[in-house]
């Protein structure tokens, strides 16, 4: 998206707050009018009182002068206050829109996008937009209004000299354009480096246990320092362009303008009938004309940063990598019979990770998929949960194509238990209910008892109201898994997907987990993905995957008798494989 399109799109956000924006604009206009009146009053005071040595009457002028000054301060405050309010309202909307679209995006987006990059867009980049509206935009409008009002007053004093002053403006604008061309790329890279630093920080915090366990602290420090230095290098370059080009140029134009004023009044003081008050007022108006322009141009780098940041936010808002589309039909999953018919799938559109996968499982039955890492086990789960769309073939539930079910019906009918149990910050009860207000405390307790989680919950100080910290770090891995079991059972699913549900459980806890799983599977269609073959021996059918294809299938005993890949895997895990 071009910078001009980004800017005008931001303006549409601003139109949501027309009332506040108009109010802020009125206060800025009043500030400009009052600011313009002050030099005129000073001119009148100089010409009518100081030059004539009349001090007494000048006291009233002085009171009016200070009154106008106070009004200017008040109007400036109110204008900036309401613009800041509009700015942060826009940022709130941008964050809400970004987060709302984030919830719609498919797993494919999150699989390839670093967490820190997303966080950076929702926090740093949106804050940069607030800086634009709260500071730069109000300054821009103030400059425009001040320019118009001041120019009118200058023309009234001397239209000839005003023309000379106006000639400086195109040169100033040209300088800003040159500055923009030189610094735009530097600012863009600088913002990208901030996003990269956030990614490094996020990954470091999430993987701190592994980092410390493998003595990788120094490597992470070096990598973060390298990115940080890169950010500093590009930011310093942009500062050089700002300091060496923009600021000196603006200061030079101002000095030249003063020189023109002095020369003009010096040459035509007597013939044009200029007074000391007029000269003073004109110098003040020149300041009022140039100072806001200089300030605005000096802040142009902030404007550039804000536009670039807004473009990054809009990229997130406009992202349409949504999960596969589902029909809003009235189909209901009644039994949970599942069938895959010659299903093939590729993540990149080039290399198939699943090739002609076919299997079926009836209600109450349990099947399992085993195989080496990368064999396609998790891909089958991703397709069934509609995280990705398959390329060829067909997936049926109760004889109906999976695409014909609504997303709500599919999600409500499928219970998912992952290898790494995820608990939210809240209470034990809220984690089991998952904020489903239809579930009562009794439903929660019933689900916990069903999966043998009630015993350890009941021993907690606040029982079901006990606080769960982020990721449930105060619970053991087995306790976290039992809580996710209770969460799954509380939703009363017809189909269970178990993705390495016992992979991170110790042997002692595994027995309890296995007992819970047996009860969970009864009366439900179950698909399990497992590395521990001991956990799936009672499955109705076990499928062995290799490079995206089913190479063996059968019960545990049948596969052992076959003495193929499954047999070797089983022997290896049992520690009985001959070297």
Task: Describe the residue ranges of each PLM region.
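Helix-loop-helix
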Residues: 53-57, 153-167, 241-311, 316-317
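Membrane-integrated ABC transporters
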Residues: 1-35, 50-61, 79-83, 87, ...
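ABC-type nucleotide-binding domain
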Residues: 325, 331-579
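Alpha-helical segments in transporter systems
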Residues: 19-40, 61, 65, 83-84, ...
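Juxtamembrane helix-loop junctions of ABC transporter transmembrane domains
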Residues: 3, 26-27, 34-50, 68-115, ...
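Transmembrane helices of ABC transporter permease
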Residues: 16, 20-33, 64-71, 135-189, ...
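An intracellular "coupling" helix at the cytosolic face of ABC transporter transmembrane type-1 domains
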Residues: 16-19, 107-108, 124-133, 137, ...
